[in-house]
A protein has these predicted regions:
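Rossmann-like NAD(P) dinucleotide-binding subdomain of oxidoreductase/dehydrogenase enzymes
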Residues: 93-170
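N-terminal Rossmann-like NAD(P)+-binding subdomain of aldehyde/semialdehyde dehydrogenases
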Residues: 2, 6-101
Length: 170
């Protein structure tokens, strides 16, 4: 059933992450670029879904959800390379002459469960950070925003293999 499907997706994503495909920064930036293109291509569909689910007008849909996602996308496209670099920190005297740094490594598979009230923003914005961080993601949009959930599923299916980003509805 549904539980087995989720377990299979989780196992496939763990294997995808272990393969290392999501680690290179150029791959992460490509994912973000693909997502931006898809959001722009489906902007009217997203607005219609938000109208259907929550009664949001086009202006509110753009200002409170789509525009904020696009703004965050632009920010991450400009900054992801910098965020992925090692950060040098002070080395304790006892460890001299070693050099110390913090390495920013991806963690694996991220589950993002979002609420109904800002269903596009609060599903896609955490996805952006997870992808920029080099992780695989399972998205669980709110069942109380079915039209928005469906367009999120469609956009993600166009942009990513299920092993990288999967949407679980219901």
């Amino acid at each position: 059933g549904s539980e087995m499907c989720i377990r299979d997706r989780f196992a496939a994503q763990k294997a995808c992450f272990a393969s290392g495909i999501t680690r290179p920064v150029p791959h992460r930036l490509d994912q973000l670029c693909r997502l931006r293109r898809a959001i722009l291509a489906h902007e009217q569909d997203i607005e219609a879904a938000l109208q259907s689910d929550l009664g949001k007008c086009r202006t509110e849909a753009y200002m409170c959800e789509i525009g904020m996602v696009l703004s965050e996308l632009g920010y991450l496209l400009r900054r992801t390379r910098r965020y992925c670099r090692d950060t040098h920190v002070l080395t304790p005297l006892a460890q001299f002459p070693a050099r110390s740094f913090i390495r920013h490594d991806p963690m694996g598979v991220v589950l993002i469960m979002s609420p109904w009230n800002y269903p596009f923003l609060l599903t896609i914005e955490p996805l952006l950070g997870a992808l920029a961080g080099g992780n695989c993601c399972i998205l669980k949009p709110s069942k109380d925003a079915p039209a928005t959930s469906a367009i999120i599923r469609q956009i993600c299916a166009e942009c990513f293999p299920l092993e990288e980003v999967a949407v679980v509805e219901g």
